[in-house]
């Protein structure tokens, strides 16, 4: 048996071309001083060059467009478009032509053909054209598989395939950080870096919160009733540049009232990023669900609801505390003790009975205190004792207050 049989020639030819938008023609201007040897030769040549901008010949960008010279890069979130053409190069009429285009990724195989219907016949020098589109959602190696089947005039069924391999790169590097506030607010800092080789126009960067939170963007400065982006009027992100976005998430009332709901790992939401590159090519990227570990408060949580920023020296002031039973099963019987520090003195009776506190419920408590030392003072010295388990919970450095003398505050 001859293993080196000649390769069979097919009657049809398959051509595949990636569809991308053209780019502006660039040239490298060469200039010199008038007193140099070339004189005005370079200047005259640039003015006569049809690709330069009239009146601005030294600009690298011209007025002409150039078609892509190679396959180029494909980035995650962009739309991959390709033109597929099957041409009859023979002098025979070909029948029952079927063209199928699949995209093989590392995890799945997708059919991209707009139509899989069989074409009854294809005359000589005629062609079948198709344009496919696919939003790229995976990085790594992709293989475009184009398969063509047809029948010759003699009734012989023919079939051939072609493979086109390309890599999908990551366009953005997204890093997130969470900051937990005492008021159950969560601040999300998103750092977005452009890791491509061309500038990006950041059309939209938004946070889609989960059902547990409401979100507010902190990337706009309000001046005289008008909002201005913290990044200025130009929203371009140059290659390797990083931009930081900040968001504030607040638990919805129905979840905030339930102390046991926002514990452990909670889903915050996901980032939705939309950008445009050269000549308006659009890309979109959505992160997976962002999760954060909620801070642990133990069985009993004490938080400050209201406290003045500035108080007078040796004059009483009030603060409002919120005490929450974070346990989902056990009722607590609490006793409040107030311990004085060198600067902070509590006003009232220590050892007060607060009564029973049911699971996942809260109570509000107003306390009076005064400071005997000026400056920024820390509020400390609260103790809660559960009489059922004989367990004491200590709360120090729960808030800070600025203490000024009475004369200084009166003058201001």
From Swiss-Prot:
This protein is called Trafficking protein particle complex subunit 13
What family does this chain come from, according to its entry? Answer: Belongs to the TRAPPC13 family.
InterPro entries reported for this sequence:
TRAPPC13 (IPR010378), TRAPPC13_C (IPR055428), TRAPPC13_M (IPR055429), TRAPPC13_N (IPR055427)
Note the subunit structure: Part of the multisubunit TRAPP (transport protein particle) complex.
Q: Which gene encodes it?
A: trappc13
**From which organism does this entry originate?**
Xenopus tropicalis (Western clawed frog)
Which Pfam families does the UniProt record give? TRAPPC13_C (PF23643), TRAPPC13_M (PF23647), TRAPPC13_N (PF06159)
* S-S pairs: none
